[in-house]
Amino acid sequence: MKHLLYFALAVLVFSCRGTDNPVANKAPETLLQVDSIVRSGDLRLGTNVTLHWYGMDVDGFINGYHITVDETSSFTSSTDSTFSFSIEAGQDTTDILLTVAAEDNEGLIDPSPATLIVPIKNAAPEVAIDPDGLLSDSAFIVATVDWRATDDDGDETIESVEFKLNAGNWLEIGTSISLLSFATDPQGNVAYYKNAGFIDSISGADLQGENFIFLRARDRAGVYSEVDTTAGFYWKAANSATLIINGQPEYIGSTYKEWMDSANVDYDYLQMDAVSGAGIPAYWDPTFEIIMSSYSKIALFTDATVFPTKSGDDYLLNILALSTQKFLQKGGKLFTASQFSSNMAGGAFLDIFPVESLVFSSGQARLTNDSTLAPLQPGFPSLQPQNIVLGITPIIPSADATALYNGQITKIAGWNGATTMGATRTQNGSINQVFVALPLHVFNRPINHGGILLDHVFNAVF
C-alpha cells in the first residue's frame, strides 16, 4: 500500500512539472449553412441575400467572424446577415465571392475560411402611375398624378425616378413618393410641381391634341423599369383673370355665365358634376391650389351637394377650404354664393369664409317672391327672388367680417334667429371676399338682380 502511495505522488509531481510546456491554442473552424449555390439564368438570387454561418473551437469559444465580400472586410459577432450586393452599372448578373473566418477568444483566426460563390441577378425596378390620377380625357389647367416605384432588390436600390411630357426630355424627380402636378399656360409651357411645391418649367404641352406623361425608374445597376404612361388627355389652359367654379347643375351655371357676359367680364368656366364626376379631380389638393393660383378673381357657386374625395364625400366649401385660403393669402379675390343645409353646421369652411356660424331653429325660414334682401353696404343692389325660396339658412358673420344683406324672412312654425344673409371681409383696406348665403340664380325678379350683383362685385368692388 505504501509503494502505491509513493507512486501516485511521483506521478503528481512529474505532472506538475509538465505545465512549463502548455498545449498550443488550436484555430477555430468556420462553417456556412450552405456550402454551394448552384443557380443560373433567371434562377439566380436577387441582390438581397440572407446567409447563416457558425464556428467551432475545441479549446475555447468564438469571439466573432471576419466577413469578406469581394475583398471588402468587416467584423461581426452575429451568425447571420442579410447582404445587399451590388452589381456594376450595365451588368445584369454577377458572382459574389464571400468568405467567413471565425476568430476565437485568443484572437486566432481560422486560416481556412468558409467560402461561398453567390450567383445574383439584378431585378429591374417597377414604376406605376395611379390610373385615377387624371381625368379620363381632359385636364383643366392642372394634371396631377400619383405614382409608386418599387424594386425586388429593395426600394433603396432605386437611384432615380424620371418623367417626360409628350416627346420631351426625361427629367429626374427624386425617389420619394409624391404627387406630381403639371400646369399649362396658353403658350403650352408647363410648370411642374412636387407635392404642390414648384420645381421648374418646361415646354411641350399640346393644347390641340392629346397629351401623355411618361414615368420610369432606374436602379443602382443602371437598369431602367418599363415605362408607365398616363391615358391621353386634352389640356385646357387659363385664358383670363377670372374663374367661375360652378358646383350646381349645368343649367344653373348657364345663368351665371349669362350674367357675367352681360357684365362684360371675361372668364374661364369650370363645371363640376358630383353625379357624373365631370370636372372633379382625383386629387383635390394640390390640384385646386394650383388652379386657383392661375387667377386673381374667382366666383364660386355651390350648395349642399356632396362631392367625392379620396377620403370620403364632403361639401364643396369644405373640400376647397385649404386651396381657397392659400388663394386669398396670395391676394386673390373671391365671390361665393352658397345655400346651406342643417348638415353643414360645422366644417373647415367656417375658418376660411367670412362666416362665424349658421343660424338654425325649429320651424322654417323662407323667402317669398315679394321678399327683399336689403343691402347693408353702399353700392350693393337689393335682391328679390323669382319664386318662394324654402330652407333659408342665415349666417352669423365672423368677427372680422361685415354684414352685407338682411333678409325679409318669413318665419314659419316658431322659427327664430338672425336674418343676415351675406357678409364681406376686407384685406389691406379693400374687400377681398363677398359671401351670400343663398342660391343666387333664383334672384332675378323683377329684373336681373343676381347679374347686377355680379356686375357690381367684379367691376366695382374687385
What are these language model-derived features?
Residues 3, 8-39, 222-226, 462:
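Bacterial Sec-dependent N-terminal signal peptides
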Residues 17-20, 418-420, 425-462:
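Extracellular ligand-binding/catalytic regions of CAZymes and related secreted enzymes
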Residues 53, 96-102, 147, 211-217:
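Hydrophobic/tyrosine-rich beta-strand signature of extracellular beta-sandwich/beta-rich modules
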Residues 56-71, 150-173:
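Solvent-exposed loop/turn segments flanking beta-strands in beta-repeat/beta-sandwich domains
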Residues 87-95, 202-210:
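Surface-exposed, short loops/turns at beta-strand junctions within beta-sandwich domains
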Residues 103-109, 218-224:
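Short, solvent-exposed loop/turn segments at the edges of extracellular beta-sandwich modules
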Residues 252-346:
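Helical hinge/lid and interdomain linker segments adjacent to catalytic or ligand-binding clefts
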Residues 305-396, 400-405:
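A glycine-rich, often tryptophan-bearing local segment used as a flexible ligand/cofactor-contacting loop or short
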